């Protein structure tokens, strides 16, 4: 069963084949993945997110990404990193077809680093995401700090 709309779409485009080499290749890939799912605990089992819907609009120069989509992108990049690390760590000859297939995957470390500069590990926007945001949040904390003693004094008098 497919976990993303893209995967459903991709499998729907698969066609019947009578080509022996194509059939052999598909069977080898399927068997390697079956073995991974059965025996490899270090292979990621989640985090496969279809990002196309929110990445496509970012091709425009004035586009922006919302926080939820940024969280999803980070999750997908983490999963991608884990998948490539898994295949890099397996010995040559083990899962050779999937390993070869994963060799061309790009991990986009700069994008990952930029996301980590914007959101924390809980997916919340960091105060330091921008200088302007830092100043706004600092000002709010100072005002909250000034209001708190006044509220306490008013409540004590009441």
Where are these regions (language model features)?
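Conserved amphipathic alpha-helical "coupling/scaffold" segments
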Residues: 1-140
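Extended, Lys/Arg-enriched charged tracts that mediate electrostatic binding to polyanionic substrates
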Residues: 135-158
